[in-house]
Amino acid sequence: MTAGAARHRVAAVGVWLALMALAAWLCTRATYVADLSAFLPSAPTAEQRVLMAQLKNGATARVLLIGVRGGDVAARAEASRRLAEALRGSGAFDAVHNGESIGDEAAGQRLFERRYLLSPAVDARRFTVEGLREGIADTLSLLGTPAGVRIKPLLWRDPTGETVRLAEAMLPTSAPRVEDGVWVSRHVPRALLVASVRADGADLDGQAAAQALVRARFAALAGPGLTLELSGPGVFAVASRATIQGEVERLATAGTVAMVALLLVAFGSVVALGLAALPVAAGVLAGIVAVSLGAGSVHGLTLGFGTTLIGEAVDYGIYYLVQARPLGAVGWRRVHWPTVRLGLLTSLAGFAALAFSGFAGLAQLGLFSISGLVAAALTTRFVLPVLAPQGSPGLGLRQRLGAATGTLLVRLPRWRRALTALSVAALALLALLPSPWRGTLASLSPVPAAALALDASLREDLGAAEAGTLVAIEAPTETAALERAEQAGARLDTLVGQGVLQGYDSPAQRLPSPATQLARRAALPDAATLAARLAEATAGGPLPAARLDPFIADVQAQRQAAPLMRADLRGTPLAAALDAQLLPPDRDAAAGAPWTALLSLQAPAGTAGLDAARLRAALDGVAGARVVQIQPELDAIYAHYLDQARWQAGLGALAVVALLALHLRSARRLGRVLAPLAAAVVLVLAGLTLLGVTLGVLHLVGLLLVVAVGSNYALFFDHLCLDDAARDTAPDTDTLASLLMANLTTVVSFGLLATAEVPALAAVGQTVAPGALLALLLSAAFITPRPAGPRDGTPPPLVGESPGSPPK
């Protein structure tokens, strides 16, 4: 080696080290997320946009459901009051509700001062003689009820009961039971609280801090026997991040230990072990950096998927360290690098389609795979030859592994017909059985069933069970959204009267549009007119008109009052409810994005659900109104997700075929390379189907990995068939050992992934571990011919020390 060449090689290693240091630093600066919004479409429908806004930044994403269980009624109520007080004073929450009236006084006063602008009963008829008489009679009838205690002090100022009607309009259709002054469950011994976290739903650190604060405050005040329950979107997101992080760490640790053990057994050298790990480290770092820079954040599932590079990227290091022993670095680059390069290109062709997916999560997986594999291959090509010019410095059990592989190569072709028949039978089975591709968006989430059950229980207790259907109304401005919500409300009132709906909640019930408030204000008569009508309406009744001067004064004051605006409710409990129903454009949305009003619907008791077609017909003509069926929309998102992934996987497969055809330039060779890959995919699919596994997007990604890994094996065996010499002489022990070692590391790493508690990661492992093993065995059976014996009839040697034929 010349001095100039040596300097160039040292410089290459120096550049690699600098790049790895930069990548490691960038990884520490990357943002890691765990919410499912990364797996939602980038070009959603209007209905899907509503759901996505709630998942990302909506008020729904900031809701924290709190339960206090154990103890007796008094203990739970006291704990609820003390916890609510502590949380309100912490500054971490916009609002905390537990059924107490604390904080309602200011809001109530503001509403009372504009009750005639807000009450749905106020119109021109309300202040006629007949309207006044009916209103007063209704109010007097309530004096003997439990509500009379609150009505009586207001009687002379509000004889028509607009305060009562306003309260009825603003209360949700269903509400939790109140006991000892706080909300409680109807079914279990539990006090209930609802908090709105100040941190954005996408701010998982802020959400985690708020949850930790709740736990700390509860621990400080809880009496004996009391336990805390937390749920809500933020709880799920924080727990999912922790689960994914824990699984990634566990899998990375277990995978590293397994790889270390396998490589030490194979190489018998710590130095070789360290060298084999370099492509893996480069691949993982490059993948994280590429996704972080390209997507702005790295999803936890993408990071978990990155641990699979341990299984594939280490193959490159093994190929070089083992195969370079008899050839040296220059010989390895000449003989074996073209095959490794072609295998890399086929992998990139398969994953390139994913990188252009309309789903950010799927695009992340594609980008991570491409970047990681390229970095691992380039590290093998340019760095390992400098650090280990003669390959692995150790021997270990490589020769025994190579001998065992050689024996397998002789025996497997005898099973070719049986394996072909098995593959055909598997294909027929897949054609006859119902499609196993039935995954759901929830299948990507690591939230356990127990946590989902607790969430459903808390929501049911609060009277906020998950709505199956809602109405979303888009409008260019907040005012227009309220006006359209009022129009929709008038249509829904008809359905309530017909028994089609039990009720609905609308932002316009809490904050009527300015136009509606001004119309009600215009219906208020002047003092003289009102006094005359009151005298007639109260004649012969229990309320003398002479005592209703406060009522007349209030009406006159409100004739001059400005309409109530959203800003007037800031800091009150009503603000949180309004924020959940009247949504501004998303912060990341383009200019001109619409406001959205959400109207939740309650189906009549005992019914299976709402008739969406009838709802759409009723709302026909209300601009921007859409009926959103939540579960069908989620199913549609995932179905589109899966359908797009299938098309992209198909395009990737076509790209692989085209690349191989261009390189091999032989239909026969192309067929024998593709046959074991196709058979491995079919057998894996049939096996998972027979086991009752519901297949989803991540299984599809796993199949791409099977093709990516298996193509290396198929191409190697294809080169054994290039000429007669390959048929008469078995490949050398080191080459065979490198194949077996690469396969073992892949199967072990993906086998560990199959044990993950995160379903999405487990899906990849369940697919690739058996698929990689099958790809090796089927390649050996379908491609490797039986070695021809010498003419004297003696059998050929199983293994030899001469290198295999170079690829062309």
Predicted regions and their residues:
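Alpha-helical transmembrane helix bundles of large polytopic membrane transport and channel proteins
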Residues: W25, R81-A191, G499-Q581
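Transmembrane alpha-helices and their membrane-interface boundaries in multi-pass membrane transporters
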Residues: L293, L309-R325, R341-F356, A360-Q399, ...
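Juxtamembrane segments of multi-pass membrane proteins
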Residues: R416-G540
